[in-house]
């Protein structure tokens, strides 16, 4: 499956940054980093959401399906920025990589049929390329199951909001896996990101203590 790479441009001390920027607003002394950290914790606990928009993450998402990346793009709160690998530069000679969903992979006949279709598409793309058809046109044959690669920038508030929706047990399984990978990569990046992930990146039912979804999985009760 795919992997998440947190780039070095990412702020290593997001909580301290939140507290520092909030301190400017409050006319506080921002020369003491310990006080800035505590102020950042206060902002988080008080849900002063605007301050969460200061720390940015820069990540490479590599090896996930074009389908799940398309869904990743739909969550645009906080003005994220992203660039995706161009379909013009796919190596048709060696073919494209693709994702096989677990429900298909566990069935031998279904898996064989799925892979056969991918091979047919790869052969068709190679043939069209030989005819001199521009790749911007042949790319219309590329499937959503093809893996792709993007680089993206998101602030902490945007990622928290995404986690509440996309870590839900009813979310698309590859998206849940992708977000788990994001959480693990950020945990490994710094202690302050680990704190944010462990305390604020979770399904909204866990964050709120009740479920707001009409079609609940039953994990949490609906709000009375």
What are these regions (language model features)?
Residues 1-224:
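Family-specific signature for flavin-dependent thymidylate synthase
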